[in-house]
Amino acid sequence: MDRILLLPELSNSETWMRNKVEWADKDHTVFVFSMYARNPLAINTTLVQKGEISSLYDLLDPKWKGRISMNDPTIQGGGFSLFQVYVRHIGIEYWHKLAKQEILISRDRRQIMDWLAKGKVAVTVAPNNESFNQFKEAGAPLEFLTPREGTYLSTGNGSVSLINNAPHPNAARLFINWILTREGQTNFTKSMGVPSARVDVPTSHLPPEMLWKADEKYIAEDFSEEAMEDKTASMKLAHDVFDSYLGR
């Protein structure tokens, strides 16, 4: 990918957060252009009182049984990304217990937030940022919540690669160089509801807790080379936990 970055600013470390160009792999085939603190949980504030949930383990309380939704962790996406981080951080047994809480699992990210906004559930695990922001702006009583176990840095949909032997390679190169510009990143962050890794892109429309902070300690990065190499093993664990619960 290095050779197709035509604009000098794109290869300049000062353009990007942490003063470096972020790659998800040592061969520089995956460029990371969005990086943000993942909000592991979202709550409906009419159903969850302040302080009721401060830890992931609080979700195991019987009172939350049938009142939790989650983005499907058995496919690539936000639910799996969160599972991958925390299964390494707090262990597999927690997830077996959480599955027994009769959580509502869906692959429809908007549906999950709709359930939360309408009060069908009280808590959502791995909420979708874009849908959260839309419901919040519409007046839904939603808040993000970071448990005391900590949070991690995520790229979400914010990475790009050039596929070998794909049609229209020149158009793909042109798009990559545009999407990484300030204009391209401003459009991306406004439409997706997540920050850009560029330091010159506005963030005033985003929840402050989502923004990367230099003095914050994050427990993992879901775009690290280690995370990329661990995906297959973690996906197997996710299926081991959730397939029987989902009737597969």
Q: Could you describe each region identified by the protein language model?
A:
Residues 45, 72, 128-129, 192:
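Short secondary-structure boundary segments
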Residues 123-143:
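A ligand-binding cleft/hinge motif common to bilobed small-molecule-binding domains
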Residues 96-99, 104-106, 140-166:
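Periplasmic-binding protein-like
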Residues 61-65, 87-88, 117, 121, ...:
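Sec-exported extracytoplasmic/periplasmic mature domains
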Residues 56, 112-113, 121, 131, ...:
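Short, hydrophobic alpha-helical packing/hinge segments within bilobed ligand-binding/sensory domains
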